[in-house]
Amino acid sequence: MEELKSIIRDIPDFPKKGIIFKDITTLLSDAASYQRMIDLLSHRYIGKRIDKVVGVEARGFIIGAALAYKLGAGIVLVRKPGKLPSETFKKTYDLEYGTDTLEMHTDAIKKGERVLIADDLLATGGTMSAVVDMVDSMGGELVECCFMAELEFLNGRTKLPVERVFSLLKF
């Protein structure tokens, strides 16, 4: 894992002063590293009968689509409001200073389908908690929330069903 961690670069003071941003684009643009990351994540779920992989806008699409392909599952997109063309299920959730809303097509997950949620990074857990609620409300059976990386010092997993959280890389 250290070789993958070493490829992710730190960008100081982005998006604002005092934050050290973990830039995953360096890992994604390196074919061997990207393939290794997807192989490591997908290996965890082989044989777990995943029906749908939920990818969270926007970098979760990059990981979710590749995992869905490897697992023979469908991909479901969770997007910001107004980006999906059909009827949507909406979830508004609290941020540190305000609220945000996510949407998913109402027919994207059927009752009883086994769902893997994929995103690039677990930080505070607010977004992922909202997505878990959406999957639950639609009748999906959450297998796990998987992340390429986790910022452990932000304690995001405390907002999630901890036994169903997996992060490949931890910072």
From Swiss-Prot:
Source organism per UniProt: Geotalea daltonii (strain DSM 22248 / JCM 15807 / FRC-32)
One Gene Ontology term, aspect cellular component: cytoplasm
Keyword Nucleotide-binding part of the UniProt annotation: no
UniProt-listed Gene3D superfamilies: 3.40.50.2020
GO molecular function, one term: adenine phosphoribosyltransferase activity
Subunit field text: Homodimer.
Keyword Transferase appears in the UniProt entry: yes
Annotated compartments: Cytoplasm
Name this polypeptide is given: Adenine phosphoribosyltransferase
